[in-house]
Amino acid sequence: TFYITWSFPNRKAWSSVVVGNYYSNQYPDAWKAAETIIPQIPGLENKTLSFINALLGTSYPEVVKEAALFNLATLRSQTVFRLPSGHMMGWEGVMDRFGSCEGSCTHVWNYETATPYLFGELAKTMRDVEFNYATKENGLMNFRASLPLSEASKGNNPAADGQMGCIMKIY
């Protein structure tokens, strides 16, 4: 068995601005990541299998189970990432070399419902970005949060469906 670990602390934002990666706060280098995570792999695998078996053991139609599992894979892809502050951010999708459509677009991410149920604390970081960083003083919420977070309310216009969806998620 062999493992490949990495450490790329200098993640770029939606532009050329460097915003960093959350994991670089947790592990100073790839070696430390390996030392810490490799011993946890059996437990993580067991938790994953327990979750999958619980879902597959339900009475939901097969097509629903398949759709749920396929869509959950997005959460472990390059579509999402965490800033050093711990805030979860997301692209609308990914291409070969970079993400597609930046800014955790509110009227796209409103349709993603797995994170609040499976990773509630991560979902709260997305709400924090939407309401405390991407909302302008006049109450309009940018539908794409700029990075760094200090710039999140600059630029893009609001989208009614995005802002209303964010309000519903808080409710």
Question: Where in this protein do the model-derived segments appear?
Answer:
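Short, compositionally biased
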Residues: 13-28
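Substrate-binding groove/exosite segments of carbohydrate-active enzymes
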Residues: 25-171
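A broad, low-amplitude sensor of folded, mature protein cores
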Residues: 2, 13-16, 114
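Short, solvent-exposed loop/turn and secondary-structure capping segments
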Residues: 9-17, 125-129
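Short Pro-Gly-centered flexible turn/kink motifs
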Residues: 1-8
